[in-house]
Regions:
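Rhodanese-like catalytic fold shared by cysteine-dependent sulfurtransferases
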Residues: 2, 6, 15-40, 61-96, ...
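A short acidic-Thr-Gly-centered motif at the start of a beta-strand
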Residues: 41-50
């Protein structure tokens, strides 16, 4: 009887853990749905046509090491930047990027821009590393 009770409790605990994991996954996918992702080539084309403004969410060390997209707005900090650092026109297309696909700073900053009322916000998940790998021009700092 104790064995059955123990197995039942372990099963319930495992079920509870799987549900909380599923909620976490749903929450993170909601962020991804709010902030569309774009490719390096899409960004290159849109920047050339002046359709979007690039926004760099990297720290100074990454900027000095890898450079920045030409003409990018350089945020003071991806988590604590002021909306006044972004273009005044909240309908202007903004594309946020950070170091690479393992960096979450661009998503954090893009979410903050959405909260501040910007309507056309995107993220380039490949970041500056993907930009450089694709042979695109960078501005050195």
């Amino acid at each position: 009887m104790r064995t059955i009770l123990f197995v039942s409790l372990v099963g319930l605990a495992a079920l509870g853990c799987s549900k909380s994991e599923s909620k976490k996954s749903e929450g993170s996918s909601m962020v991804e749905e709010k902030v569309p992702e774009v490719t390096v080539d899409q960004v290159d084309t849109a920047l050339a046509a002046s359709e979007w403004q690039a926004v760099d969410a990297n720290g100074d060390a990454t900027r000095k090491k890898m450079g920045v997209l030409p003409g990018a707005v350089l945020l003071t900090d991806s988590e604590t930047f002021s909306a006044s650092e972004l273009p005044a026109d909240k309908s202007k297309g903004l594309v946020f990027y950070c170091a690479n696909t393992h960096c979450g700073a661009s998503h954090e900053a893009a979410s903050k821009a959405l909260t501040a009322g910007y309507k056309n916000v995107k993220v380039m998940p490949e970041g500056i590393a993907g930009w450089v790998k694709a042979g695109k021009k960078v501005q050195t700092i």
